Amino acid sequence: MNIILANPRGFCAGVDRAISIVELALEIHGAPIYVRHEVVHNRFVVDGLKAKGAIFVEELDEVPDGAIVIFSAHGVSQAVRHEAKRRELKVFDATCPLVTKVHMQVARASKKGTKAILIGHEGHPEVVGTMGQYDNEKGGIFLVEDVEDIAKLGLKEDEDLTFMTQTTLSIDDTIDVIEALKQKYPAIQGPRKNDICYATTNRQQAVRELAKLAQLVLVVGSKNSSNSNRLAELASRMGTPSQLIDGPQDIDPNWLQGVTTIGITAGASAPEVLVQSVVEHLKTLGVTKVEELEGCEENTVFEVPRELRITEVN
């Protein structure tokens, strides 16, 4: 058997930044540091930060007065920000800048009273935070997950409308939804390019190439990672069996029966160390060759907050 590694794969700039913020806050201020929601959706990463003194909570009422709290890469609603300010919590914001960009689109629509339609997955923390940027009762924000949801909106075709998208969606599915929105609401406005981030786009394109060459695709990523799930779905959609795994412990040897080429990729929140542990485990199961696809180079870097950056330099 041989392995083909997707390229690019694994950590994106937003995830790198979010993890650095937690690690630097712990280094500078000491434990405990509270983090609202998993800073990124990866069990290995979260467990590592817990071991260093990070405490993960779902709501701010779990954070003691005067404590330091970090907002996860997925972003938070305005209500959460107001609550943190009211309680005088020290906040470091690890929201991905590309998510913040979508937040600003929603905030502008809210200020104008323009009704907004968000394409995304209900209940995902990024979606909850993004919808929470809208606070104008004269308008409203509405969520659609697929083309079928559009018929349920009940909005007038000539209304002043705008749309935006979650950053970690399936590119193909999102294009279909946007086209359906434009057909039903010809005057709807939106970004010139959808809001799906560069890392999601690049990793999905890499999986397309991988699925053409492999008989099985393994996606390293946690079950609650949106972008990791989309990678597994895309490989399957292209006709190549796929499995989403947290690490080598999840691999079932039965998956490998009759397989000569295994494709491996990783979601944007999965570290390379997990990919390499999967590779090493597969070598014990008969893999003799490992190669990597050519892919686009990613050089995007997002800086950490100034207070942490200054200390980091010193």
Curated annotation (Swiss-Prot):
Highest taxon of the lineage: Bacteria
UniProt pathway: Isoprenoid biosynthesis; dimethylallyl diphosphate biosynthesis; dimethylallyl diphosphate from (2E)-4-hydroxy-3-methylbutenyl diphosphate: step 1/1; Isoprenoid biosynthesis; isopentenyl diphosphate biosynthesis via DXP pathway; isopentenyl diphosphate from 1-deoxy-D-xylulose 5-phosphate: step 6/6
Residues holding (2E)-4-hydroxy-3-methylbut-2-enyl diphosphate: 41, 74, 124, 167, 225-227, 269
Gene3D superfamilies in UniProt: 3.40.50.11270, 4-hydroxy-3-methylbut-2-enyl diphosphate reductase, catalytic domain (3.40.1010.20)
Names of the cofactor(s): [4Fe-4S] cluster
Cofactor binding, per record: Binds 1 [4Fe-4S] cluster per subunit.
Protein task: Catalyzes the conversion of 1-hydroxy-2-methyl-2-(E)-butenyl 4-diphosphate (HMBPP) into a mixture of isopentenyl diphosphate (IPP) and dimethylallyl diphosphate (DMAPP). Acts in the terminal step of the DOXP/MEP pathway for isoprenoid precursor biosynthesis.
Family statement drawn from the similarity comment of this UniProt entry: Belongs to the IspH family.
Name assigned to this protein: 4-hydroxy-3-methylbut-2-enyl diphosphate reductase
Organism encoding this protein: Glaesserella parasuis serovar 5 (strain SH0165) (Haemophilus parasuis)
